[in-house]
Amino acid sequence: MPSLPQDGVIQGSSPVDLGTELPYQCTMKRKVRKKKKKGIITANVAGTKFEIVRLVIDEMGFMKTPDEDETSNLIWCDAAVQQEKITDLQNYQRINHFPGMGEICRKDFLARNMTKMIKSRPMDYTFVPRTWIFPSEYTQFQNYVKELKKKRKQKTFIVKPANGAMGHGISLIRNGDKVPSQDHLIVQEYIEKPFLMEGYKFDLRIYILVTSCDPLKIFLYHDGLVRMGTEKYIPPNESNLTQLYMHLTNYSVNKHNERFERNETEDKGSKRSIKWFTEFLQANQHDVTKFWSDISELVVKTLIVAEPHVLHAYRMCRPGQPPGSESVCFEVLGFDILLDRKLKPWLLEINRAPSFGTDQKIDYDVKRGVLLNALKLLNIRTSDKRKNLAKQKAEAQRRLYGQNPVRRLSPGSSDWEQQRHQLERRKEELKERLLQVRKQVSQEEHENRHMGNYRRIYPPEDKALLEKYEGLLAVAFQTFLSGRAASFQREMNNPLKKMREEDLLDLLEQCEIDDEKLMGKTGRVRGPKPLCCMPECAEVTKKQKYYGSSDSSYDSSSSSSNSELDENEKELCQKRLDQVPYSLKHTSHCKIIQQPSGSHNLIYSESPVYLTTLVFLSEFPDSMRRSVSCPRSISAHLPSRGDVRPFSSQQVIPLARPTSASRSHSLNRASSYARHLPHGSDTGSTNTLNESLRQLKTKEQEDDLTSQTLFVLKDMRIRFPGKSDAESELLIEDIMDNWKHYKTKVASYWLIKLDSVKQRKVLDIVKSSIRTVLPRIWRVPDAEELSLYRIFNRVFNRLLWSHGQGLWSCFCDSGSSWESIFSKSPEVVTPLQLQCCQRLVELCKQCLLVVYKYTTETRGPISGIGPDWGNSRYLLPGSTQFLMRSPLYNMKYNSPGMTRSNVLFTSRYGRL
């Protein structure tokens, strides 16, 4: 009998119920792959009391984490944080405070550091009122008061707590004897003649963002708050010293006055915006540009005082972090600045935790912009955490397995091993610096796109101003970190720090060449690598067989073109050309142009080479207008379907007037070649033919425009101010004929007397002219689009390499060391482009000789270049000018007998 069911046993509804658990039945559901959630940027805002910070975090799309979470991408705290917390941060995290910033944010520390800097550079730090720190400087203050009494002068002083805030404990005195001697106070001279607005005293709250201290990066927010007093200002006297609503502009003080005006607009009330204030200055005929320039200079000089302290503390917190890596710290600072009646800014104090309260609408508008734009500038990415963890893992494995890129040198190493070791270290140093430069360029591009209302004030774009600030930085390190100033000075003066990517690549290439020499490899010759279009240096490619020339020399008496190609080549060529549409094969649309290589050096070859070029003048389909080998600047400006013009209207610059013999030979060759064009069909691939035709057309156009550029460059001349072309050429020839006499003088002038900025300005005479001419030849809006101009830029950088050694080496016997930059370049340089570069170098050499001669003859400045030259491109001391003489082309077919005009390439010439 069947057994009865027991409790807990699941029974099916029938003997064949599919719901019963059979041993062979699969009850697992098919797994559905869930979409991976996108990365989320997290923020810990437990340390702030301001609601505007949380609102901006939400607006940025960040996710707020629990208060105890210490792994967030962003950590925001109102108060200063301990250095241990910064040490524990991962590289992907950001926190809104720098260690060591208290050196300028505490009133007593700011006064002490400013006093030291004033002793070193008194002319640069004139924006801080005279200050005494009590009790240590009580005696000096009393001596100063006694000197005033002897001169029968009386001044007002403002007394502040050493570490106070929000206006607490501030008072005004006129009798120095009343100041307590043992309290920790700050005593400053009171600015009695401030700039007034509607009769009220006011100060400015300027917001500053520091995104990095290694290297230093400072941004100024072009808006802020104007905080006004609430009683009409009267110069201080014994009767009104206690009226703080008149003399103090702090919001925390004046908001308690019944006369405090709260207004929803930015142009009324006791609190207004700096944006409105700049409009007010402009309406009253004040120099707004100078106002912002003075503010920026004050901010940068103040943060230069803090930089030695901040950088030292930051590196102590992050000991394993290489220089130039992304900073885990940033800071929004509030500068309180007072304007005197001459609009000179005076620094009052700096707040490292400025208030982000939003009592009024103007507070919300200004402070929201400050925070929102600051977070955008930080460029916090969702991938930062993942990349950081992967980097840590790779670094741990490298340490575990001892995978050091540079092997240690044993004590008994030979000279050869020591040289190899030095080269390896040099290459690693260059690679690290190259990586840093590329990161900095990428970061600057992001900053330029997301600055919003911020402006970068350090490093400035003005090179002269940057040199001035760097000099102040050196003084600051010497003043505050005398024990470690030498190491910081060496780091700042490292020549690699100022090199660009192209210069570093050139140095890496040089290291590899030296390494190959050391290893005994002689396979690669220093200099430009053999190009595929040099017949004597490379095998003949299929494309050259079809459309190129043979290795036989050109015979002017020969009238038949069939002897230049063998039968197999002609058959292959005919098969390819057989598939060309009728419109392309027709004699009215196809013209064969022959140019001997000796004419204008179009082919870089020692043996004469004959070049046959097919120029198709009919309309190409859209799919054939763009080729992989076609530069963007060419393909972007090819004629469209509706823009096809007849050959008579096409813009061509003749390179030379052909002789009658060569013209007849060209016509005979064209007719002979046309007779061999087949009219049947072939089974070959049409796509292969179209690709060949596209490459042919774009390469022909590029070569033609490069030939025109070479022709223009050869016709350019450097003109001595006040002399004719012939006189200028005679002057250059005289220097070269007497080179033994001039060599040491020119070397001293170029390599010693001219700094890097002025060396660049000398070459800018040539560079600016070429930059003006190229867009008109290539028909592009900007020369930066051209691959040829990028090649020129590499040549200019090479000439300025190693403080001008690149150009000076061109005066040696070989004079072609600069060509080594193309030996390992991934971009193929054609012979025409190489000839353009050679002419470019020749113009730069002539330009240096003319500038040197002008300086010696006119007894100009020792540098030969006036301070205003950079603004006018060509202007030298006085009213004279260097002229780049070049023909005035209108890009039409002109007869060779036409006269050409001399032009100075400036912005007033809109077209050629």
UniProtKB/Swiss-Prot annotation:
Pfam families according to UniProt: TTL (PF03133)
Tissue: Highly expressed in brain, testis and trachea. Expressed in brain, heart, kidney, liver, lung, muscle and trachea. In the brain, highly expressed in hippocampus, thalamus, olfactory bulb and cerebellum cortex, corpus callosum and striatum.
PROSITE patterns: TTL (PS51221)
Cofactor(s) needed by this chain: Mg(2+)
GO cellular component, one term: perikaryon
Residue numbers spanned by region c-MTBD region: 388-450
Residues that, per the record, bind ATP: 160, 166-167, 188-191, 201-203, 249-250
Compositionally biased residues, Low complexity: 549-563
GO molecular function terms noted in the UniProt entry: alpha-tubulin binding; ATP binding; beta-tubulin binding; metal ion binding; protein-glutamic acid ligase activity, elongating; protein-glutamic acid ligase activity, initiating; tubulin-glutamic acid ligase activity
Subunit structure: Interacts with both alpha- and beta-tubulin (via C-terminal tubulin tails).
Name used for this protein in its record: Tubulin polyglutamylase TTLL7
Organism of this sequence: Mus musculus (Mouse)
